[in-house]
Structure formats: structure tokens, C-alpha cells
Amino acid sequence: HRWITGKHPRLFDPARDGFGGDTIARQFLFSAYQAELYRELQLSTDPTLRAIAGKAEREVRYHLDHAAQWILRLAGGTDESRSKIIISLRDVWPYIDELFVDDELTERLTGAVPRPSALRAGFDRTVASVMTEAALEIPQVQPAWAQGRSGVHSTLMGHLLTELQWLPRRHPGASW
């Protein structure tokens, strides 16, 4: 399938050599983002979003802690594990900025949802704390893409959508 051919976004790339640190790097960074998002959503003007965020924050904090502990273990382990987690973080890092881009939708939802850009400082503090403890440097890389929320995607999005639509197209009307 597509995962085998390599035609998919790097952010969703399965571990290139079986190294679980690729998954840990993605989980750590995305959980750091989600932790800020759900913390801020608890201040939402929408009571349903507040309730969901309250429950979700506890879960994502668990995932953040789990991934952070693995970052520390890998960075403090062998030379090979340290080198590989550095590569994993560097490979995922270009996709981080897109999480914090404000757009027209978030502007219209002011009060109900936080501005993505307002989440960046907390994210940076969380990530910097773990990276410092692990004696790792923040990767200095160019952002990969920053318009996905506004509907502008690379051609790789088509490959991802094709992969996601394979089952429903193969088995129309299928249900669990």
C-alpha cells in the first residue's frame, strides 16, 4: 500500500528502521501541543468544549509524561539511542509551526477556542523543559508547510487521503 511506497507526509512516516523513537518524538511534540490546547479550552465560553477539555487534558498529560520519559531515556541511553532520538526530533520539527497558525475560523470562534498562536509559549516552555533535562538542543530547521489549516496542502495530502479512503471505497456501506 501507500505506506510501503513511501508516498505520504513525513509527519505520518512509520519508523524508518523500526526505531520507536520516531513515534515517541511525534507523540511528545503533539501531546505538548494538545496539553496547552485542552488547558485553554477549559476556559471556553462553550460548556461542552469545557467539559470535553477537562477530561481530555488528564489523558493528554499522561501521554505527554509517557513520551517525555521516553525522550529522557533515549537521550540518556546509548550513543546510538541518543543519536536516533535527535534525528527523530529533527525530522518532525519542521511540522510544528503549523499547529500555531491563526486562521479565519479561529478568529470567528474567539472565546470558544483559543488562538493557536496563544498556545505557542506554553508549548515552548514544556518542550524546552524536557529538552533541557535530556541535554538536547531544540532543532534549528526550516518549517515544512504552514497552510494546511487553510486548505493549502502539498501533493502528499492526496496520497494520504487515498490511503484513508481505501477501505470505504473497497467496501461501501461497511460498518463495525
What is the predicted function of each stretch?
Residues 1-27, 77-78, 92-111:
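Acidic/His metal-coordination segments adjacent to aromatic residues that form catalytic metal sites
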Residues 12-66:
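Internal, conserved structured core segments that host functional sites
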Residues 48-111:
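A contiguous pocket-lining binding segment that forms or flanks enzyme active sites
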